């Protein structure tokens, strides 16, 4: 089988004789578009890349329809880092800093005392939230610990960020023993050792088929068709207008007076600006009032 160049793709694969499943993802435009409208410190860029990869892999391995949020909160220079994703592999990310961060800052230096919160919101079913202490050197290690604690499934992650052909790129591998399988720790350890041999230039530059052959050429690997990833913010003029209506009308009128009759709202995630004068706001209000009367 052959595939076109695998930028912004996620692949699932299965080791037929090992009862272990895997995933591979590479984020090119998905990652760079996340960074385009922000001037994040280098260490924050790398962390967001790692979180994007982790969110992509988690969304695929959990196999649900809905959204997932991976969020870091701490009392260090990096106040917040959050990634949202869904089953369509549409991803977005945002970070907020409150002090300078060195380019080579470690996770603990950026976060201070913090937690990693994973929120899973299926379209049908109950919402789930897991809180993980950021007590290990990397996001990867914290997530591996999360799977052991919450899913009782041995899981291994390889997550890398860097540059390839002059552009930011992030990529990763996930290995996991199949639930209710006969997979052995020895099988998993063997595949994990092979995964750790992957070089950055292989992870960022090779097509999936070639990469997996280099790593696992002695294994029987079934590779499934890829899924595309993309940066997708999801903001809209309608959402911004409805957000304004959360304020009392007196406060909205004051804002209009202060801003020469036009309120501008900029999406913190993608940078898109939306402008609203009094007429536009009243149109949103009339529509909201109609929906309220209908009980919607």
Curated annotation (Swiss-Prot):
Has the keyword Cytoplasm been applied to this entry? yes
Q: What is its main location?
A: cytoplasm
CDD domains tied to this protein:
Hsp33 (cd00498)
Compartments reported by the entry: Cytoplasm
Q: Which GO terms describe its cellular component?
A: cytoplasm
Query: What keywords would UniProt list here?
Result: Chaperone, Cytoplasm, Disulfide bond, Redox-active center, Stress response, Zinc
As for PTM, the annotation reads:
Under oxidizing conditions two disulfide bonds are formed involving the reactive cysteines. Under reducing conditions zinc is bound to the reactive cysteines and the protein is inactive.
Write down the superkingdom of origin: Bacteria
Q: Name one GO molecular function term.
A: unfolded protein binding
Give the record's GO biological process terms: protein refolding
Report the SS bond pairs. 233-235, 267-270
An example of a Pfam family matching this protein is HSP33
Which NCBIfam families is this protein grouped with?
A: PRK00114.1
Function per UniProt? Redox regulated molecular chaperone. Protects both thermally unfolding and oxidatively damaged proteins from irreversible aggregation. Plays an important role in the bacterial defense system toward oxidative stress.
Give the protein family: Belongs to the HSP33 family.
Sorted alphabetically, which PANTHER family does this protein's record hold? 33 KDA CHAPERONIN
Full protein name: 33 kDa chaperonin
To which species is this protein native? Actinobacillus pleuropneumoniae serotype 3 (strain JL03)
**What is the primary gene name for this protein?**
hslO
């Amino acid at each position: 089988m052959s595939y076109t160049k695998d930028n912004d793709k996620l692949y699932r694969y299965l080791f037929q004789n090992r009862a272990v499943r895997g995933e591979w993802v590479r984020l090119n435009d998905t990652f760079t578009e996340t960074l385009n409208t922000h001037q994040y410190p280098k260490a924050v860029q790398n962390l967001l890349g790692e979180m994007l990869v982790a969110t992509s892999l988690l969304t695929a391995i959990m196999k649900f329809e809905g959204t997932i949020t991976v969020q870091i909160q701490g009392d260090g220079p990096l106040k917040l880092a959050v990634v949202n994703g869904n089953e369509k592999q549409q991803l977005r990310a945002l970070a907020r800093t409150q002090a300078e961060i060195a380019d080579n800052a470690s996770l603990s230096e950026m976060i201070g005392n913090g937690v990693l919160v994973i929120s899973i919101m299926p379209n049908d079913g109950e919402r789930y939230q897991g809180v993980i202490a950021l007590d290990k050197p990397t996001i990867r290690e914290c997530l591996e610990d999360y799977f052991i604690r919450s899913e009782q499934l041995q899981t291994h992650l390889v997550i890398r960020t860097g540059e390839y052909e002059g552009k930011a790129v992030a990529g990763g591998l996930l290995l996991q023993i199949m639930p209710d399988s006969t997979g052995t720790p020895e099988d998993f350890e063997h595949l994990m050792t092979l995964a750790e041999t992957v070089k950055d230039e292989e992870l960022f530059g090779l097509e999936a088929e070639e990469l997996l052959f280099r790593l696992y050429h002695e294994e029987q690997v079934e590779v499934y068709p890829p899924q595309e990833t993309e940066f997708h913010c999801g903001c809209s003029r309608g959402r911004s207008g409805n957000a304004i209506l959360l304020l009392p009308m007196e406060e909205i009128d004051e804002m209009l007076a202060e801003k020469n009759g036009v309120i501008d709202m900029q999406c913190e995630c993608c940078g898109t600006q939306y402008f609203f004068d009094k007429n536009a706001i009243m149109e949103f209000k009339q529509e909201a009032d109609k929906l309220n009367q209908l009980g919607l």
